[in-house]
């Protein structure tokens, strides 16, 4: 029985004045408590989660950057910013989890309300503003959870710029966070694409971005995979320029994409509980409205790099078909967040089962053979 869809999803989609951030915080708090507990009850609950949501098949396994991803579906950054539930994500069937975004300085984020669900569009609208306890705090949390460095699934760490740090200090800010965490993550992501930190997206310009990437690579003595997360609102020429920069700086890959600021993708004129016109609201849109453009960006990146630069696809994944379209466009791995909130924790398992069906239908031996298979012809 899917208790999430029976009990929690109706609450999420109801017209009751329930703050989505409150729901998220409490759900995450429960998972964190479960992760910390050593009680027999907690052990039994975690075993139940693994039995209910776990699913693996060797045909879905991917090997990238010296890491093994038993399943290709990961948790996107933004849900577990401070890593407080880090050990739990494998129990829920994820093949990897991306923590953060974290910044060098602890910061509260933007004023509330700052997270909105828009059920009629299967979307979310957020202006969180990188609220987090700091890179050092995340480092302490990860040392506590994984004292021997052994993690059941690959853990990614998403790095952002502190709001109080001027753009001129962005290089040192990113480097500071990386120094705190570089031995504690399996891969790292440079986030210059959130719309919720003033001026951050300007760092996507090649002239601004190259010094940041070069400085991080100079610090990357342990040769951790370093990826870049980009916005869907870049024009194609900008995407191509960034792809070439990523190759020049020997990045491990690109995550496509972050949230969009294109409010024309929504059918509503106001955010829930707000009177201000949507056009005046600051923030980014995730969920189904992002699906098409994120897949277009993935396809463009794959073509531009001739499949030589791995891509993690994210944006509007609510089903196995959504994930499949991103994979055949060029994504080696995919991430979910908004779709996972709407569809519930069984989504990860459902996606994996559906991917196997599509491999069988296409006559392909494994998921690696599907990556980019439709990028050239479409």
Swiss-Prot record:
The source's superkingdom equals: Bacteria
**Co-factor binding comment:** Binds 1 FMN per subunit.
Q: Key word Membrane present in the record?
A: yes
Q: Classify the protein's membrane topology as the record does.
A: Peripheral membrane protein
GO BP: 'de novo' pyrimidine nucleobase biosynthetic process; 'de novo' UMP biosynthetic process
Query: What Pfam families is this protein classified in?
Result: DHO_dh
Q: Where does substrate bind?
A: 81, 126-130, 191, 196, 258-259
Q: In the UniProt entry, which residues are flagged as the active site?
A: 194 (nucleophile)
Give EC number(s), comma-separated.
1.3.5.2
Checking SUPFAM superfamilies in the record gives:
FMN-linked oxidoreductases
The UniProt keywords, alphabetically, are: Cell membrane, Flavoprotein, FMN, Membrane, Oxidoreductase, Pyrimidine biosynthesis
The UniProt function text for this chain reads: Catalyzes the conversion of dihydroorotate to orotate with quinone as electron acceptor.
Spell out the protein name for this chain.
Answer: Dihydroorotate dehydrogenase (quinone)
Which organism does this record belong to?
Answer: Synechococcus elongatus (strain ATCC 33912 / PCC 7942 / FACHB-805) (Anacystis nidulans R2)
């Amino acid at each position: 029985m899917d208790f999430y869809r029976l009990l929690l999803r109706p609450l999420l989609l109801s017209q009751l004045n329930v703050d989505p951030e409150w729901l998220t915080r409490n759900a995450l708090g429960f998972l964190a408590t479960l992760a910390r507990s050593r009680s027999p009850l907690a052990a039994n609950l975690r075993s139940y989660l693994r039995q209910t949501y776990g699913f693996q098949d060797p045909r879905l396994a991917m090997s990238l950057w010296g890491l093994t991803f038993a399943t290709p579906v990961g948790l996107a950054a933004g849900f577990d910013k401070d890593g407080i539930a880090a050990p739990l994500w494998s129990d829920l069937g994820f093949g990897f989890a991306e923590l953060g975004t974290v910044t060098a300085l602890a910061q509260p984020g933007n004023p509330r309300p700052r997270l909105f669900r828009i059920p009629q569009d299967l979307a979310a609208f957020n202006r969180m503003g990188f609220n987090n306890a700091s890179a050092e705090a995340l480092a302490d949390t990860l040392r506590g959870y994984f004292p021997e460095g052994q993690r059941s699934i690959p853990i990614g760490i998403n790095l952002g710029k502190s709001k109080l740090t001027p753009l001129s200090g962005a290089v040192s800010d990113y480097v500071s966070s990386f120094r705190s965490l570089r031995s504690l993550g399996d891969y790292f992501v440079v986030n210059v694409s959130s719309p919720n930190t003033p001026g951050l997206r300007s760092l996507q310009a090649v002239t601004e971005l190259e010094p940041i990437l070069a400085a991080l690579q100079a610090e990357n003595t342990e040769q951790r995979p370093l990826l870049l997360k980009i916005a869907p609102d870049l024009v194609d020429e900008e995407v191509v320029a960034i792809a070439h920069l990523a190759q020049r700086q020997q990045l491990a890959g690109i995550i496509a994409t972050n949230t969009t600021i294109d409010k024309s993708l929504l059918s509503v004129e106001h955010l829930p509980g707000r009177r201000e016109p949507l056009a005046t609201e600051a923030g980014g849109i995730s969920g189904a409205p992002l699906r098409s453009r994120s897949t277009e960006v993935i396809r463009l990146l794959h073509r531009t790099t001739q499949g030589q630069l791995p891509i993690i696809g994210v944006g509007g994944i609510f089903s196995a078909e959504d994930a499949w379209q991103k994979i055949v466009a060029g994504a080696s791995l995919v991430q979910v967040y908004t779709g996972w909130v709407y569809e519930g924790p069984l989504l990860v398992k459902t996606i994996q089962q559906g991917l196997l069906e599509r491999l069988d239908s296409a006559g392909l031996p494994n998921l690696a053979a599907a990556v980019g298979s439709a990028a050239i012809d479409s």
